[in-house]
Amino acid sequence: MNIDLNADLGEGCASDSELLTLVSSANIACGFHAGDAQTMLTCVREALKNGVAIGAHPSFPDRDNFGRTAMALPPETVYAQTLYQIGALGAIVQAQGGVMRHVKPHGMLYNQAAKDPHLAQAIAKAVHDYDPSLILVGLAGSELIRAGERYRLVTRQEVFADRGYQADGSLVPRTQPGALIHDEEQALAQTLDMVQAGRVKSVTGVWTTVTAQTVCIHGDGEYALAFARRLRAAFNARNIHVIA
């Protein structure tokens, strides 16, 4: 069995270099919620050195709140901003002799696109118009995945090791109890359930089905590095191969 393990990087965390030795895919912040040209270049070089697949991590323009502010932007604006961010990272990747492989929206852009078909379509169209060979990463079973499929993009359905789930398969909003899983044992058990059994237990106790093609570890988490090591060990023990 194979699984992709991804992390959101270039967001100002000291553990980026070490995480790049453990994950198979890196989602690199493109400046709208975190990062800048220099952090993008540094992350790209480190990812290439470690053989890690590189992806753009576009966001709403929200550096003050780390891309976690809900915004009601017109789809055309989201399309333009997504293209802008993908293009910025793409230029750096190309200049370093690499190939960009995927796009994964960040924060509230990701969450809103999971439920809003118009927003999802704007993102999928931007990815398609920039490079139709790019993989679109989105929440498992979401509108973003469906939009990507309509544009005939390769999609990758994502699950989260450290986030609580609602009964409909969506993430618990960060403003609500149960949004973040701080207990390492619980996060590990949830991840293995999603990857091996295709199910996740919601905060209300209801089991719901999920398709796990890639697992996200948040690079800004306090214990991200230690958890990544433990998760890799658990995968190895179960003959689950981490590969992009």
Swiss-Prot record:
- Print the keywords alphabetically: ATP-binding, Hydrolase, Nucleotide-binding
GO terms assigned for molecular function: 5-oxoprolinase (ATP-hydrolyzing) activity; ATP binding
Top-level lineage group: Bacteria
Q: Name one GO biological process term.
A: carbohydrate metabolic process
Its Enzyme Commission number(s) read 3.5.2.9
Q: What class of enzyme is it?
A: hydrolase
Checking Pfam families in the record gives:
LamB_YcsF (PF03746)
The record's catalysed reaction(s) read: 5-oxo-L-proline + ATP + 2 H2O = L-glutamate + ADP + phosphate + H(+)
| Listed InterPro entries | Glyco_hydro/deAcase_b/a-brl, LamB/YcsF/PxpA-like
Q: Could you tell me what this protein does?
A: Catalyzes the cleavage of 5-oxoproline to form L-glutamate coupled to the hydrolysis of ATP to ADP and inorganic phosphate.
Q: HAMAP family, from UniProt?
A: PxpA
The record's family statement is: Belongs to the LamB/PxpA family.
Assembly notes? Forms a complex composed of PxpA, PxpB and PxpC.
**What name appears for this protein in its UniProt entry?**
5-oxoprolinase subunit A
